[in-house]
Amino acid sequence: MANVKVKIGIIGGTGVDNPNIMTDRQEKFVDTPFGKPSEPLITGNIQGVECVLIARHGRKHTVMPTDINYRANVWALKEEGCTHIVVTTACGSLTEAYRPGEIVFPDQIIDRTTKRPSTFYDGQTNSPVGVCHIPMHDPYCSVTKQILANEAQKLGIPHHASGVNVVIEGPRFSTRAESRMFRGLGGEIISMTAMPEVALANEAGLCYAAIAMVTDYDCWRDDHAPVTVESVIATFKVNVANAIKILIAAIPEIAAKDWTEIINERKSQVKPPILDSTWVMFIREYRKIGSDDASKLM
């Protein structure tokens, strides 16, 4: 069996959604069964590896976490032929050990979101058929995550190779009571966009990993000033340069690996398998006209 050709989707947060990190850039307007992605795709190359970039919040950071079209973003990357999704995200720290300015490569999630469609299989006319009970015991791809951590180590960037990511609805920050509750649940960092993004990537059979940039201590500490947007942005700007360094160094390492077995295993966990837009259109018309006339669509 031929090796799987690696193509990497990048979902960038503020500062890491700059298309200048790519060569041979082209803007591509796409639509999906779930609507349009946050922004047009940017296709191109990083270190000779084909990549596709999406600005998660829009290039002007105008889309709040709840309103991001996560399904369209992930679906668009799947249809572009991506095998991996590597994302960047800001996060707060829920432990003294993870300090502002450091990088975390999370391996687990506690989902506290409440308002977001979290599956492609929602029973609507534009969705794949059936119900997908995707395994989520290890939501992040451990192999991709380790490559990112290895490159951070080589670059001498302070980082943590694992972390439990608590994902809140936002856009507000936590109360002190909530922050302490999240610590009690085992959370180590807190962010707003990993869910349903990682679940959808798993439904799409893609390897998903994150570069989480610690911008602040969340408000669980009595002796620390409350979180403010200004303090978060100031630290985040310092983190961005390190995140880009890791991304650029890791992408050729990801591409050099034979992912055939891992990708096939991920695809085998998706039951029923995810379908492309052509098949979704077929299903939509099939439902309209009924099985007796389905041959007309062949």
Curated annotation (Swiss-Prot):
Keyword Transferase included in the entry's annotation: yes
Positions annotated to bind phosphate: T14, R56, H57, T89, A90, T193
One example GO MF annotation: S-methyl-5-thioadenosine phosphorylase activity
Alphabetized UniProt keyword annotations: Cytoplasm, Glycosyltransferase, Nucleus, Purine salvage, Transferase
Binding site for substrate: M192, D216, Y217, D218
InterPro entries in alphabetical order: MTAP, Nucleoside_phosphorylase_d, Nucleoside_phosphorylase_sf, Purine_phosphorylase-2_CS
Superkingdom per UniProt: Eukaryota
Catalytic activity annotation: S-methyl-5'-thioadenosine + phosphate = 5-(methylsulfanyl)-alpha-D-ribose 1-phosphate + adenine
Regions that span the bilayer: none
Residues flagged as site, Important for substrate specificity: S174, V229
Any single Gene Ontology cellular-component annotation: cytosol
Pathway in which this enzyme or protein is active: Amino-acid biosynthesis; L-methionine biosynthesis via salvage pathway; S-methyl-5-thio-alpha-D-ribose 1-phosphate from S-methyl-5'-thioadenosine (phosphorylase route): step 1/1
Family to which the UniProt record says this protein belongs: Belongs to the PNP/MTAP phosphorylase family. MTAP subfamily.
Self-association state and partner proteins as the record states: Homotrimer.
Function: Catalyzes the reversible phosphorylation of S-methyl-5'-thioadenosine (MTA) to adenine and 5-methylthioribose-1-phosphate. Involved in the breakdown of MTA, a major by-product of polyamine biosynthesis. Responsible for the first step in the methionine salvage pathway after MTA has been generated from S-adenosylmethionine. Has broad substrate specificity with 6-aminopurine nucleosides as preferred substrates.
Entry-linked PANTHER family: S-METHYL-5'-THIOADENOSINE PHOSPHORYLASE
The protein, known as: S-methyl-5'-thioadenosine phosphorylase
